[in-house]
Amino acid sequence: METMKATVFHSANNIRVEEVPRPSAGVGEAVIKITLTTICGTDLHILRGEYAVKPGLVIGHEPVGVIEELGEGLTGYKIGDRVLVGAITPCGQCRACLSAQWAQCGHGEGVEAIGGWRFGNTINGAQAEYLLVPNAQANLAKIPMN
């Protein structure tokens, strides 16, 4: 199993850079090699324990990177493309997404009130060497090389 370095939340005021399994892309997903990422106020709230984040989760949600791996079903992207990964990660299929209210995405679970922020909140985030992007068709934007 390949590994990577990632910033992992353990508890309030306890995050560590650790070796974790490197993700691989499934259908509709992409793996991005992170080249730039930020730390924002939300990350500081997580660090202080002000948001309920599951211990063991990789934090971070504002990355830029290069497509390393593409799962089946994605069009318009290729390995090596520079991309921005959206901080809001809509599923594209729930009631909110179908109404163009992506920030209220229920991730296909019918719970629209939880909103579309998933990276570093409910799934592994971007403070890592690689990021698995679900529903990549809706969650990536190409960045011109020049």
Where are these regions (language model features)?
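Short glycine/threonine/proline-enriched tight-turn/helix- or strand-capping micro-motif at secondary-structure
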Residues: 14-21
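Conserved hydrophobic "DFG−1" position in protein kinase catalytic cores
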Residues: 8, 22, 46, 132-133, ...
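Active-site phosphate-binding/coordination module
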Residues: 43
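NAD(P)H dinucleotide-binding glycine-rich loop of Rossmann-like/cofactor-binding domains
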Residues: 93-146
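Residue-level recognition of beta-strand termini and adjacent short loop/turns
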Residues: 11-13, 26
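Glycine-rich beta-strand-centered segment in the early N-terminal region that forms part
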Residues: 21-37, 47-98, 103, 123-124, ...
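Short structural boundary motif marking the start of a folded domain
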Residues: 2-7
